[in-house]
Each structure stands twice: as structure tokens, then as C-alpha cells.
Amino acid sequence: MNASPLECDYLVIGAGATALAFVDTLLSESAEATVLIVDRHHRPGGHWNDAYPFVRLHQPSEWYGVASRELSHGSKDTHGFNAGLYGLASGVEVLAYFDQVMQQRFLPSGRVRWLPMSEYAAGTNGAHRVTSLIGGDAQSVTVRKKVVNATHAQTAVPSTHGPKYTVADGTNCVPLNRLPQVGRPHAACTVVGSGKTGMDAILWLLENGVAPSRIRWIMPRDAWMLNRANLQPGIENFERNMGSAVDQFEAIAKASSVPDLFARLEQREQLLRIDEAVQPTTYRCATVAPGELAQLRRIADIVRLGRVRGIEPDRIVLQHGSIAADPDTLYIDCSASAIVMPPALPVFDRDRINLLMVRTCQPLFSAALIAWVESHVADPAAQNALCAVVPSPEHPIDWLRMWAVTLANGARWRQHAGLQAWLMQCRLNAIAVYMRGVKPDDTVRLALVRQSGIMAGAAAAALPTLLTAARLNETGQPA
């Protein structure tokens, strides 16, 4: 049966982190806008609802979440592989946080309606349809302004995406979510997947007493990773944070080639890799603490024969060969691609807003900034000029491509006084977090800020040459 029709200014598809960051800033910057949020999950948080039970943020809690509400407790970890660095919120904490955002801010505003366990279907001429996944009722929705697509940055997790390889009967293969439920020791543990979930699986096994000699790691691709120690809040970390930016910009400005760029970045500990003898072929914005990296490097049995094709009781079949396996092996599937590549779309697309990244590796900040632009900038061309899309990462060269757009966007933001004022007070803006506690008369730290700006300009000037060389190299022509 059809329920009563609904009306709203903005229909937001999805209630994940980027959607909530957008809505939060929209409520703050627009006095009257009404919002309808539609999501297939039973509570806000998107993929966090499906994540493994021991999942944690991979970045400091200080600049995660929505702009209006703190998530961080402002304390450092005193034990574990992240010891000495600021805390990483657990999945339970993140879900509780987003539930509080919905229940204590969005719904009490009277301007937000939330339809959980519901599915959106596109309509025409401003008419859209939402169907309850439980009750089956369908409601038409009239959208007065725009539809906001918060599903482009879909995050695939093992619990919702099964393995793409065959698993023979009698073989014990579990998704990462079920790892804490394994009730007995196994002769060996094999982690399938080299992304951040694979790293988390390795670290969990080590934390829970599995000897490194009993762990095998199927690593289809080695990755470059960001150094979490360079991304820390707190005034005591100001010099390292700003110095990190200077190091990255200087590496871009002085690099004679793309290989030279990555050599400089690694030498300055801006990018890290598991094995210094193996050249990484991917980059996905994964962040790792030095303590975690030291633990990951304890795994000696790393298999680099491509992706798994099949698991049999006594062997693993891969793209480039087969290897013997102990029949009493526990296989942990971490092969789901954490980042799903979004389509090539502008952020502002007539009557639609696509929540895509506008700063490297910062989707939540990007969503909040897009909401600010929607609230304060009327011209579509001007909106998209402020929100050029940063490509999602896949290959190492994407580190450079992401910075190219990020620096260009930043230059345009600095020309907009209103946006610049918002940026400097937004808790999702890591730069604003870094600047907390820096006094106007702190000449030493302010000089470092100016140096960062100068080197950013030098990097922006050098980027086209490096990217051109990379493109020529990809086509087989001299670089």
C-alpha cells in the first residue's frame, strides 16, 4: 500500500558518515532547509553497521564525524600498537556517536526526518519514491531543492561482500567479522587480502597470541601507506604536523621523476611500506602507526602470487601459481575492496549533489564543505569551482593526482573570505585542529605555517611536469 506523500528541500540517500557530515553542516548554515534521510540500515552510520567487531578508526578521532560534535576524548593510547599516539575510536563508539547525532541534534531540530530500513528509487520532475524494507509501504517524495547522493563512497566490508574465489568443502574460511568467534586454535592462519582490513586481521591475530610463524599473508599488491604519527592533534605535535606538510610539498617540488618523488617521501617517513625491497603498486589512503608497521613486518610468510582463485583442503590456487597449505588452516577473508571507485561526476549536478572528495583522503570534511558551499554560493559554476573532485585513490600515482586537485581547491578557498572563516573553525578540518593553541605572537610556529604555504606553491608549480611524465610513462613513451 502507498503511505502519505512526503516533501522536503533535500533528500539525502544514505545515512553513513558522509551523509551525516553534510546534513550537520547544512543545518548549521541554512536556517530553514528541511531534510529527509533514507537508508537501508536500521541505525545511522552506514558501513559501520556491517564492520567487524574490533574495527577502529584509522585516523585520529579529533577530526572524524560531524562538525558540530566532538568525537575525541583528547587522550593518547597508553598501550597497544598505537601507543603514544592519539586514540582511535572503536566501531561501537562511532555508532553510538552517530546515533547521538541523529537523536540529539538532527531529529530535535524539527527539520530532519529519517527513514531507516528503507530503499530509495529515483523519480522524475521532483517526484521520488521511498519503500520500507520491512513494512513494504511506499511513499512518494517531492524534493523542492536537491537530491544528495551519499552512496558514491560505498565501503565494501567482508560481512556484506563474500569472497570472489571458490572455497572447497571442508575448508574453514570465515569473513573477518567472525574471527572473534573462532573457538579453537588452528595449525595455521591465512589472511586473504592486503588492504587495511587485512592489516587489521594480522594485528588482531598477533594481539591475541597467534605466533607470527603461524600466520600467512596473501598479498596481491603491496601498498604505500600514510604515517599516522604525522597526523596527530595537539599543540605538542604542531612542528611535526606542519613539518610533514613541508616535507611532502618539498618532495613534489624537488623530485626529478615520479620514482624519485616516492623515494623522497619514504626517506622522510611520509609514506611507508611493508617491505622496503618490494615496490608498492597501490595506494588507498591507508594509515598505519609505526608500532603497527613493526608488527606487520614480523610476518615472514607473505605470498605475492596475485589474487586467490580457489582454496582447497591442502592448497591455495592463485593467479600466478599454487602453494601447499596445512589442512588445519583458518582462512580469514579480507578481500572485499574497502573503497569502491565512484563515477566521474561533478559535485553539483543540476538538481543533484554528489558527495565526493574535495580534499585528499578526507571524505567527511569534504561533505561538510560541500554543504557550506550549497548554503552560501548560488551559482552552480562557482559551486563546482570550489568543489573540484579529488580522484579516489587506486594506484601510487594517485597520491600525486589527489594533491594536484587538493592544492588547486585550497587556492580557490583562500580567495573566499566566508569559506576561509568557516574552515578555520571547523573541527573536521585537520589544519584548523593543528592551529589550535597557536598564539598570534608565536613567531616560530607561524613562520612554519608560512613556509608550508610557500612550499605548497612550489609543489603546485611542479605538479604538471611530474603528472605529464607519469602519463607518458603509462603509454610506454619516454618519461
State the predicted function of each range.
Residues 19-29, 178-226, 365-416:
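Rossmann-like dinucleotide/flavin-binding elements
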Residues 84, 90, 94-97, 149-209, ...:
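Glycine-rich dinucleotide-binding loop and its adjacent helix/turn
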Residues 268-269, 273-341, 435-479:
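C-terminal catalytic lobe of FAD-dependent flavoproteins
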Residues 203, 302-444:
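Glycine-enriched catalytic-core subsegment of oxygenase/oxidase enzymes
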Residues 78-157, 275-278, 285, 292-318, ...:
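Feature captures the FAD/FMN-dependent oxidoreductase FAD-binding
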Residues 11-13, 140-155, 190-192, 326-337:
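Short hydrophobic core segments
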Residues 1-10, 28-33, 141, 153-180, ...:
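Extreme N-terminal leader/targeting segments of oxidoreductases
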